[in-house]
Every structure is written in structure tokens, then in C-alpha cells.
């Protein structure tokens, strides 16, 4: 890409029902777009687990520090889960996208909708569907082996899938490599949008002189 016509980063939001392939696809995207895409790092008040690194897995803070971040508008969104706070730090996201690096969010539809509502101009959202509900049933059964859990997960999946209409793109994950390829195409084209071209006016003014 011409150094005089760079693009800002995007907030790439990926969702799918459990067993839809979201996690695998996200890992592959990070591996293949490593110079242009980073995984979102959340802030949390929970204690670090063995092997977790501050600033890589999470930003670990006290509850007092977390509340202060919220009160000073430094969190894009946050929630309390099982007694611990989790949130998306505004500075981490904006520092990346303003320098041309995109941020990947592998989240459920509720988190996706929150980001769409507050950061619409930066968000590109993709919902991943399993090849079929029968295939999803097979995957879930292979994971748990318990029919009652599978039945519950399938019900949850149908509810989640019903929210796909608000996403920018919907992909049926017949093949992981093909799904990754499709999302990489989306990624490239979205970063080439006029509104994401940094210093475009200056570039054009010099171009037509």
C-alpha cells in the first residue's frame, strides 16, 4: 500500500453460536494478519491465572481502579460476571486503530451490539453460521457427550442465530480455511473504504497537481 495513502484500523467483531468455529477462525486470522490485526485485550478485576500475562491476556486491575476507568469514560463497555468486572479499554482500541492496526473482538451478539451502538463507524461485524444445525448438534455432542447439554446449547444457538441480521456480514462455515479467506477479503475491502483512508484529501490534492 502507498505510504502516502494509509488506512485506519477497524474493529473486527466476530460472533457465532458455540461450536460455530469462532475461536478457531479468530486464531487463524491473528496468525495470518499478525502485522495488521491484534486481539482485543480486556480489563478485569479477577485474579490472574497461572501463565496469564498482564497486558497480553488481560489488563489486571483492582476494583477501585476499574470503577475509576468507568467513571472517567475510559471503558467502551463493561459488565460484571460472577463477581468480577470485565471491560474493553478505550485507549487500547483507539491507539491501535488510529495507527492503522485493527482490533479483533471474538464476542457474543450482546457484546457485538454494544460495540455497534457506540462505535458504529469503526465496527465491521461478521456472524459465522455452522454448516447446518445437524452438524452443530454433532459437534456439540462430541464436546460434551450429554444429550441434555446438547439440547440446551442448540436452543441457545437458535436464539443467537436469530440476531445475525444486524451484522454486516454472515458467513456459513463449511470449511475453516475458506471462511478465513472470506473474512480476510472483507477485512481488506473494509480498510480501503474512503472514510478510512488517512490523509486522503492531501493525497488527492498532490496527485492532481
UniProtKB/Swiss-Prot annotation:
It comes from the Bacteria. CDD domains: GMPK (cd00071). The gene is gmk. GO terms for molecular function: ATP binding; guanylate kinase activity. Its main location: cytoplasm. The keyword Lipid metabolism does not apply. Pfam families: Guanylate_kin. Keywords: ATP-binding, Cytoplasm, Kinase, Nucleotide-binding, Transferase. Transmembrane segments: none annotated. Residues 9-188 form the Guanylate kinase-like domain. Essential for recycling GMP and indirectly, cGMP. The keyword Lipid metabolism does not apply. It is found in: Cytoplasm. This is Guanylate kinase. ATP binds at residues 16-23. GO terms for cellular component: cytosol. It catalyses: GMP + ATP = GDP + ADP. Its EC number is 2.7.4.8. InterPro entries: GK/Ca_channel_bsu, Guanylate_kin-like_dom, Guanylate_kinase, Guanylate_kinase_CS, P-loop_NTPase. HAMAP family: Guanylate_kinase (MF_00328). Belongs to the guanylate kinase family. The lineage of its organism: Bacteria, Pseudomonadati, Pseudomonadota, Alphaproteobacteria, Rickettsiales.
Amino acid at each position: 500500500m502507498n505510504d502516502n495513502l494509509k488506512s485506519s484500523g477497524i474493529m473486527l467483531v466476530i460472533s457465532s453460536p458455540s461450536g460455530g468455529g469462532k475461536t478457531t477462525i479468530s486464531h487463524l486470522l491473528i496468525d495470518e494478519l499478525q502485522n495488521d490485526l491484534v486481539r482485543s485485550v480486556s480489563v478485569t478485576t479477577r485474579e490472574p491465572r497461572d501463565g496469564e500475562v498482564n497486558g497480553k491476556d488481560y489488563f489486571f486491575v483492582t476494583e477501585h481502579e476499574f470503577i475509576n476507568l468507568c467513571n472517567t469514560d475510559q471503558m467502551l463497555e463493561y459488565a460484571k460476571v460472577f463477581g468480577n468486572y470485565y471491560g474493553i479499554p478505550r485507549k487500547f482500541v483507539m491507539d491501535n486503530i488510529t495507527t492503522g492496526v485493527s482490533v479483533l473482538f471474538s464476542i457474543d451478539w450482546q457484546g457485538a451490539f454494544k460495540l455497534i451502538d457506540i462505535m458504529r463507524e469503526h465496527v465491521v461485524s461478521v456472524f459465522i453460521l455452522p454448516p447446518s444445525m445437524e452438524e452443530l448438534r454433532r459437534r456439540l455432542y462430541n464436546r460434551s457427550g450429554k444429550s441434555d447439554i446438547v439440547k440446551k446449547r442448540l436452543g441457545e444457538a437458535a436464539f443467537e442465530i436469530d440476531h445475525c441480521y444486524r451484522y454486516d456480514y454472515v458467513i456459513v462455515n463449511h470449511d475453516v480455511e475458506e471462511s478465513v479467506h472470506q473474512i480476510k477479503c472483507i477485512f481488506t475491502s473494509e480498510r480501503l473504504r474512503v472514510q478510512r483512508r488517512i490523509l486522503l484529501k492531501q493525497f488527492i490534492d498532490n496527485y492532481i497537481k
